UniProtKB/Swiss-Prot annotation:
Keyword Transcription set for record: no
InterPro entries in UniProt: Ribosome_maturation_RimP (IPR003728), RimP_C (IPR028998), RimP_C_sf (IPR036847), RimP_N (IPR028989), RimP_N_sf (IPR035956)
Its biological purpose: Required for maturation of 30S ribosomal subunits.
Protein name: Ribosome maturation factor RimP
Source organism per UniProt: Rubrobacter xylanophilus (strain DSM 9941 / JCM 11954 / NBRC 16129 / PRD-1)
UniProt subcellular location: Cytoplasm
Keyword terms of this UniProt record: Cytoplasm, Ribosome biogenesis
Gene transcribed to yield this protein: rimP
Length: 152
């Protein structure tokens, strides 16, 4: 099966329309062939096995309407949750993140640091290694996630 960004976008939109109020689709991705993995979060409760099973039963018909008949996996975004929208960066101001950008910024593509400020077009990251600040536009981010220090 060939997966295009447009198809994944259509499936993501179908999932978002079907999700109950207070539930957010954090990320959708294809993994291991026809397995559609949905990372969801919700207000006011855990993303446990029972909740994930309920979400599968809710979104499966919407995905079938879009022509998707493969397997569906629903999971919590986890401790190192992806940041896929500007609202995620705003929510986690002051937290440590790892960011990859498509085009180099200041000669590099990978950054680890603390989100200092968020604006409409991007955010400012205080780098872990030297405390310098770098401004990164949202449009250049190819991957970002919380970076928890599990040794603490």
């Amino acid at each position: 099966m060939v997966v295009t960004a447009t198809r994944l976008d259509r499936l993501s939109e179908a999932v978002e329309r079907a999700l109950p109020e207070g539930t957010e689709l954090v990320e959708a991705r294809f993994s291991r062939g026809p397995l559609l993995t949905l990372l969801v979060d919700r207000e006011g409760g855990p993303v446990d096995h029972e909740f994930c099973a309920r979400i599968i039963s809710i979104v499966a018909p919407a995905l079938e309407e879009e022509g998707y008949s493969g397997m569906i996996e629903v999971s919590s975004p986890g401790i190192e949750r992806p940041l896929t929208r500007p609202s995620h960066f705003r929510r986690f101001i002051g937290r440590r993140v790892r960011v990859r950008v498509g085009e180099p910024v200041d000669g590099r593509r990978n950054f680890t640091g603390v989100i200092e400020r968020v604006a409409d077009a991007g955010f400012v990251l205080r780098l872990s290694e030297d405390g310098e600040e770098v401004e990164l536009p949202f449009g250049s981010v190819t991957r970002a996630h919380l970076k928890e220090d599990l040794d603490k």
